[in-house]
Amino acid sequence: MKIAILGYGKMGHAIERIALSRGHEIVAAIDVDNRSEIDSPAFASADVAIEFSNPTAAFDNCCDALRRGVAVVSGSTAWTDRLPEVRKLVEERGGSFIWSSNYSLGVNIFFELNRRLAAMMNRFPQYAPSMREIHHIHKLDHPSGTAVSLAGDIVEALDRIDGWTEEEG
């Protein structure tokens, strides 16, 4: 498979290493320093663009790849208020797009457990959900996309709450 990488930081390097070890070809690795290469024939030849950049670049990265006919798998977070625009572009262009706040199998099992537990809590109004997350010092977005997904699923499943806040208490 021909893969373009959008965001060539820690995750981009890890994706490259794994992809190459499995016999895939990296046709482009786009970052802030070479953003114009997204217009290159090499980028357009990709079967998929794997996008792990940052909140300020993710939306444009996804849209630019889709406009060039390249399918996108994105794991960047803290920009998803613009997901509806990306989905509209996918529909208009007949493109392919997958986004998740976390691709870890273990975390996705945790997401499902979280949804089930939140639904069960509807029967117990004496309990209120609360969440606290701890990260390494280099974490760029906080709350993390994983925490935002968990909180959103709780809000969706619990009839007695209609939102969440980052404030403690």
Where does each model-flagged region fall?
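Hydrophobic beta-strand scaffold residues
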Residues: 26, 72-73, 96-97
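C-terminal substrate-binding/catalytic lobe of Rossmann-fold NAD(P)-dependent oxidoreductases
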Residues: 2, 10-43, 123-169
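Rossmann-fold NAD(P)-binding glycine/threonine-rich loop
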Residues: 63, 76-99, 105-119
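Anion (oxyanion) recognition and catalysis
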Residues: 20, 66, 91
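Rossmann-fold NAD(P) dinucleotide-binding segment
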Residues: 42-48, 52-76, 84-86
